[in-house]
């Protein structure tokens, strides 16, 4: 009798969780479908003229034989006063201070865009942003470190951005 009661409670709890997931998923699915449909056409995450100075993935360090590093995103150099901007509609999931700079993270359904090496942020956690909305000012050497993920999986941002 105790086992049957426990099983009933577990089933009720599982059904409740499933309903929550379905509610959340429909919004997520809409966001994902729109985001995925724009692969290769998303705007550059930096204002003004730019140059990609470091690409995604592993690379050999110049002058150091046998030393490789892994870039989790791309590094984009802009001009003086350049700003980071949202690549797609989303919600600010975090604004963090890290190693003397600011990092902004946006959630677009299951996708997350990360804007690092900012000197300041003009958005706050929980805020909804639109595509091309300014997120903050790019910091030292005018280099934005931009990352893109689908949940925890790192993606090559260059495959998603238009030129």
Where are these regions (language model features)?
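Acidic, glycine-anchored pre-beta loop/turn
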Residues: 121-133, 152
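Short basic/hydrophobic patches in alpha-helices and adjacent helix-turn junctions
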Residues: 95, 134-137
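Active-site loop architecture of trypsin-fold serine endopeptidases
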Residues: 138-146
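Extracytoplasmic/periplasmic cell wall- or extracellular glycan-interacting regions that localize
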Residues: 1-101, 105-107, 114, 130, ...
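Active-site region of chymotrypsin-like
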Residues: 110-122
């Amino acid at each position: 009798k105790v086992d049957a009661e426990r099983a009933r409670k577990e089933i009720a709890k599982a059904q409740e969780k499933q309903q929550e997931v379905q509610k959340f998923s429909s919004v997520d699915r809409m966001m994902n479908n729109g985001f995925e449909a724009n692969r290769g056409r998303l705007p550059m995450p930096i204002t003004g003229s730019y140059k990609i100075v470091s690409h995604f993935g592993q690379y050999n360090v110049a002058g150091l034989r046998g030393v490789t590093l892994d870039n989790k995103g791309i590094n984009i150099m802009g001009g003086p006063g350049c700003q980071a901007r949202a690549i797609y509609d989303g919600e600010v999931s975090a604004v963090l201070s890290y190693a003397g700079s600011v990092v902004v993270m946006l959630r677009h359904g299951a996708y997350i865009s990360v804007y690092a090496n900012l000197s300041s942020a003009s958005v706050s956690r929980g805020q909804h942003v639109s595509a091309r909305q300014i997120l903050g000012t790019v910091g030292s050497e005018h280099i934005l470190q931009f990352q893109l993920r689908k949940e925890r999986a790192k993606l090559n941002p260059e495959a998603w951005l238009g030129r």
